[in-house]
Amino acid sequence: MAVVLALGMCTTGLTGCGNEKRADGKTEIEVVSYKPEAVKAFEKIEKQFNETHDDIHLTISSPNEAMTILKTRFIREDYPDIIAIGGDINYSNFLDADLFEDISDLDAVDTVKKAYLDMDKELEFIPKDGTYALPYAANAAGVLYNKDMFAENGWKVPTTWSEFTALCNEIKESGTLPLYLGFKDTWTCLAPWNALAVGLCDSDTCNQVNMGNTTFEEAYSPVADKIRTLLDYAEDNPYAYSYNDACTAFARGESAMYTIGSYAIPQIKSVNPDMNIGSFTFPANDNEADNVLNSGIDLQFSVMKACKNKEAAYEVLEYLYSDETIQTYLDDQGGIACKDGDFAIPDTLKDMQEYIKDNRMSDYQDHHYPSEMSVDAMIQTYLLDTGDNAKEKFLKKFDSDWKRYNRDLIREVQDYQKEQEDAK
């Protein structure tokens, strides 16, 4: 919350966005993106925009450590016009600090897939009227699988938890390792955790906890059970193997499946460029209709309140949201378009296509977790604990640590609740 407080102090004098006219008479619009890996795509988009616009000059920068740079600039009241970040806790903090412009009147907002607009609303600590981000590109996480291995053995993609465990048993009996986990790097523990949680918990679980309507001990109990079940089908001592180890092992055919997001595919293909990889939604439930795809907003654009040229910023956003520009970005970076329309879906995500089309998607639970809480390490510690009360200890700690690291936020949420009740 320290970041929020610091940012909140500087919203009273928004003076940045020095968008005075350039020497050539054009209005300068600056976009800062947190994705250095997309620099080539943005350079191409920037060039195409500037070649087709006489009155606006667009500059898109994608620096390393962009979030640190942005936070420093915000404290100095040196604001870009637009920022391009993910739909996660940073977005929540910046929104809570009242840094973003309401862009509800932007035409492009009407073309965003509803699921992604809903995700952004759930990232609001306190409900706000309006729309404060334009979701652009999303990712998806479930279970990667070796399509050739599946075809050769007649294995079918599972659609329920029972089918999944039965498949794991069948693969194990054939002499092949069903899963690779690679839990040495603690962050990898969050991949199956998130993918299971979206199907087993309400998407607003964290907010419900803040309001006092539930506890993590109650909400996360089935998630804790099922993530532990994965250990029965994985490599011995997965805590000895890193993310790179797991990618390499899966690429070499040492397991049939890998519980990681599609973002791991480039790393896997660097080892085995010809590998035929698929990805399916984690079937967390025994009723397929209850399953939900774990998808989150990887990139979205927000206009800063300090922007002096909202009309020019809107023109930039409308250009960025054209089908052609979105496809330029996706061709370079992959992923899922947040805009409704006929956009190509990578072959590796084809098994998830119906979920995407039907808006059966929910955000990563960890997008709501404060980084100081180190939930990834908590999950790893829980899985290492073989005691009878391991789950109880883990979930009680989850609740107590949540209160510790979100004390101010919980008070803010509950004060808001009381105000709403008093106003009735």
Segment roles from a protein language model:
Residues 48, 52-116, 148, 152-153, ...:
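Extracytoplasmic "Venus flytrap"/periplasmic binding protein-like
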Residues 86-141, 165, 171, 191-194, ...:
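Hinge/lid segment of periplasmic solute-binding proteins
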Residues 72-73, 80-81, 110-148, 177-181, ...:
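A structural signal for short loop-to-beta-strand junctions that line the ligand-binding cleft
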